[in-house]
Regions:
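Solvent-exposed loop/turn segments connecting transmembrane beta-strands
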Residues: 27-36, 57-67, 178-185, 232-233
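Membrane-embedded beta-strand positions in outer-membrane beta-barrel channels/transporters
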Residues: 39, 69, 108-110, 150-154, ...
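Repeated loop/turn-to-beta-strand initiation elements of outer-membrane beta-barrel proteins
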Residues: 46-53, 79-84, 118-122, 161-166, ...
Length: 246
C-alpha cells in the first residue's frame, strides 16, 4: 500500500517538474522544396482474402531516402481489411559509417473500411505507425519509438468505359506520445492523381501531393531549462507508382 501511495505522489510531482522548467528561447524555421517519389510494388493474392505485398520506394533530393516494405493484408468481409507491414528506411544523407544513423525501422498496423457507390469508391484508413529511433538519443528530449496515428480519407472515381480513375486523398498525422506540451498534428497530405489500369496485372499511378510537416523539437540544457524549436516543411511531391498484381 505504501508503494502505491508513493507512486501516485510521483505522478503528481511530474507536472510540477515540467512547469518548473523555463523555455529560455523559442525559434521557428521553415523550408520549402520539391521532390519526386518512385514506387514499385508487387502484390500476391492468396486464398481466404490474404495478400502479400513487397514494395520499394525511392525519394529524390533533398531527402535521398529509400523505403523497403513487406506487408500482409487480410480482408475479412467485403468492406473491411486489416494489414500489417514492416518498413526498412535508408537515409542517403546521413553518411555510411554508422548503420544506426542511416537505417531506421518502422511498423504499420492498418484497418481500412471501404464502400462502392456506382463509379465511386470511398475508403477510410486508420494506421498506427511505430517509428523507431536507433543509436544514442536523449530520452528526455526524444522517444525511442514514436507512436503516430495516420487517418486517410480517399475517394476514387472510375471513368466510364475507360481504364482510368481519378483519385483524391487527404491524410492527417497525429502524434500520440510527443514529449511535453501535449500532442499535435504533425503532417497534412492532400493528394490528387490519375490511375491507369493497363491490364489485369499492371497498374500505373501519377499523382501530386502537397505535404505540410510540423515538428516540435525540445532541447534540455544543463541548467534544466528548455529551448523549443518549431520546424515547418512545405513539400511539393510528384509520385509515380507501378503495381503488379498476381
Amino acid at each position: 500500500m505504501k508503494r502505491i501511495i508513493l507512486f501516485f505522489i510521483y505522478l503528481l510531482l511530474i507536472p510540477c517538474w515540467i512547469c518548473a522548467q523555463t523555455v529560455i528561447s523559442e525559434d521557428t524555421t521553415s523550408t520549402q522544396y520539391a521532390e519526386a517519389h518512385i514506387i514499385a510494388s508487387f502484390v500476391k493474392s492468396f486464398n481466404h482474402g490474404l495478400k502479400l505485398t513487397l514494395e520499394e520506394e525511392i525519394r529524390s533530393a533533398p531527402a535521398h531516402r529509400a523505403h523497403t516494405t513487406i506487408g500482409i493484408a487480410y480482408t475479412s468481409v467485403q468492406y473491411i481489411s486489416l494489414s500489417a507491414a514492416y518498413v526498412l528506411k535508408l537515409y542517403g544523407d546521413k553518411g555510411w559509417d554508422n548503420p544506426n544513423e542511416f537505417l531506421r525501422h518502422r511498423v504499420n498496423i492498418d484497418a481500412t473500411g471501404q464502400v462502392s457507390l456506382g463509379q465511386w469508391k470511398l475508403s477510410l484508413r486508420e494506421r498506427l505507425m511505430l517509428d523507431a529511433q536507433a543509436g544514442e538519443i536523449n530520452l528526455q528530449e526524444k522517444n525511442r519509438v514514436d507512436y503516430i496515428l495516420r487517418s486517410r480519407l480517399q475517394a476514387q472515381y472510375s471513368i466510364p468505359n475507360k481504364p482510368l480513375s481519378i483519385i483524391g486523398k487527404m491524410e492527417i498525422f497525429n502524434t500520440l506520445n510527443a514529449k511535453m506540451y501535449g500532442q499535435y498534428i504533425s503532417e497534412l497530405r492532400p493528394e490528387i492523381g490519375l490511375q491507369w489500369k493497363v491490364d489485369k496485372n499492371n497498374t500505373l499511378n501519377l499523382a501530386y501531393r502537397y505535404n505540410y510537416v510540423y515538428s516540435r523539437n525540445i532541447h534540455i540544457l544543463d541548467s534544466g531549462n528548455l529551448t523549443l524549436e518549431h520546424e515547418y516543411k512545405y513539400k511539393h511531391i510528384i509520385l509515380l507508382t507501378y503495381k503488379f498484381d498476381c
